[in-house]
């Protein structure tokens, strides 16, 4: 049921920059990747942005969570993906001059879940992505793709804990593989 809700809320077809973009949804593999990487905490914890719970759900003003069940963590995760992450992915995809692959959609989904839309849009990776050109068959030009992915490592969140930067760089390398569609889920 949860996967159905996620996919129903995530389907969208639109045209931008002369490119008709089809269904914009993250894959089940992407969902599993993010959940596995974020890990589930059933009790609230402090991070760089305040208190979080579940799979990195930032507890907002007016929400009160000290402890939740796994099912509640899954529900919060799906709501966050549908409410914040996929709309941000759609806004970015609308600006592209080429048809995104599922790998790019999944990579952007993971990046935005981890860095936030504002965090991502302040990077060289984002600037290069928007400047990337299409091939005659409307795919991402390989030279632009390689140039853009080289900047992916800068997409970081502030890390106060020792070793966290290495973990973030590992995640960026995995997201690069997801975008290149060479990642083995």
Task: State each model region's role.
Residues 4-14:
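Sec-dependent N-terminal signal peptides
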Residues 62-65:
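Extracellular beta-sheet repeat scaffolds used for adhesion and glycan interaction
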Residues 95-104:
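Structural motif
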Residues 104-116:
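Short N-proximal segments of mature Sec-exported proteins
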Residues 85-93:
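Membrane-helix exit/interface motif
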Residues 8, 18-48, 57, 68-82, ...:
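Long, amphipathic alpha-helical surface segments
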Residues 48-50, 103-105:
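Extracytoplasmic
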């Amino acid at each position: 049921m949860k996967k159905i809700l996620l996919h129903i809320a995530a389907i969208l077809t639109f045209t931008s920059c002369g490119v008709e973009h089809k269904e914009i949804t993250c894959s089940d593999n992407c969902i599993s990747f993010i959940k596995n990487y974020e890990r589930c905490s059933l009790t609230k914890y402090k991070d760089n942005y305040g208190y979080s719970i579940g799979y990195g759900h930032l507890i907002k003003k007016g929400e009160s969570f000290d402890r939740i069940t796994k099912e509640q963590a899954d529900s919060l995760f799906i709501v966050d993906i549908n409410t914040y992450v996929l709309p941000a992915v759609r806004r970015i995809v609308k600006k592209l001059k080429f048809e995104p692959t599922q790998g790019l959609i999944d990579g952007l989904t993971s990046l935005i879940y981890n860095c936030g839309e504002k965090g991502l849009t302040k990077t060289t990776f984002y600037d290069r992505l928007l400047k990337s050109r299409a091939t005659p068959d409307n795919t991402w030009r390989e030279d632009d793709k390689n140039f853009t992915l080289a900047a992916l490592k800068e997409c970081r969140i502030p890390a106060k804990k020792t070793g966290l930067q290495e973990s973030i760089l590992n995640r960026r390398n995995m997201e690069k593989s997801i975008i290149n569609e060479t990642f083995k889920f």
